[in-house]
Amino acid sequence: MENNVIVFFLSFLSSVVFIEGFKRFQKKLRIGQYIREEGPDLHNYKTGTPTAAGLVFIPIFIAVLLNFNRGPESFLIAFSALSYGLIGAIDDFMKIKRKNASGITAVQKLFMQFTAAFIIVYFIQQINPHTYLIVPFSGYKLDLGWFYYLLSSVVIVGVSNAVNLTDGVDGLAGFVFIGSIVPLLIVGYQSVVYLSLIGLLMGFLWHNWHPASIFMGDAGSLALGGILATSFALNGLELFLIFFGFIFLLETLSVIIQVTSFKFRGKRVFRMSPIHHHFELLGWKEEKIAFRFSTLALLVSLLGIIGWREL
């Protein structure tokens, strides 16, 4: 218990202090976020806001995790954080270098993400060999054979990108992530991992609540998704991400629905996707979106805890 308290407060305080320094560093160099043209016009004023806070809180996460838990699972989660954080950092760097919102290409990003995912899945099989998915509420182990390796890799890449899609409104990705994982503390699953992340994200939100003075960037969002997916894949719990990553799944589905509908019907289902922009264009304030989405994330993840009881 004492270690858990230390993990949380160490993560929180480190995040608050070092992100503040990182903000000042970027302002001194006059670098910051470039807003994508296809996003809402409401966001244009955010151009130049410091970004890539993930470059601060992900290294802190790795240091805290490996200081308090040096088991093989922790090393693999740290590798996931590092690899996806680096992919995001490259993307953030290219945006700053090119002075626009275009980072690396989708093909380049997916290639790096799947390479990292294949490595992660390989080492998962060394740590905890399995080819099954545990079905929520039943505990049934659905054996997929060799197909599991591919599916698990797709899940890791998909969740990483889903968190990235959610990071489009001040405070949204951070609060939704916290709401999604807090219930895991009830069952004590990967306590050091999630206590550290909660502390770090609360520290980040100290600076990211509307109006945000810094964004997490791809370095943060891709890494958070990689951590979440890897921690579940370690034990065949990918299906539980339906509950513990519900909002991230919803955001991704909204993009798929929007693109598919426009391609085949010539009509848009939402005013803009991902879906948080739809509500933004309906007049919802950013604080309202962040609060309601994170509340929904918390409620759905609590349902996941009920299904967890069968494990």
Curated annotation (Swiss-Prot):
Stored Pfam families: Glycos_transf_4
Location(s), subcellular: Cell inner membrane
Name the record gives this protein: Phospho-N-acetylmuramoyl-pentapeptide-transferase
Ranges annotated as spanning the membrane: 2-22, 48-68, 74-94, 104-124, 144-164, 168-188, 192-212, 214-234, 237-257, 288-308
Main subcellular location of this protein, as a coarse class: membrane
Keyword set, alphabetical order: Cell cycle, Cell division, Cell inner membrane, Cell membrane, Cell shape, Cell wall biogenesis/degradation, Magnesium, Membrane, Metal-binding, Peptidoglycan synthesis, Transferase, Transmembrane, Transmembrane helix
Entry keyword Cell membrane: yes
Catalytic activity, as annotated: UDP-N-acetyl-alpha-D-muramoyl-L-alanyl-gamma-D-glutamyl-meso-2,6-diaminopimeloyl-D-alanyl-D-alanine + di-trans,octa-cis-undecaprenyl phosphate = di-trans,octa-cis-undecaprenyl diphospho-N-acetyl-alpha-D-muramoyl-L-alanyl-D-glutamyl-meso-2,6-diaminopimeloyl-D-alanyl-D-alanine + UMP
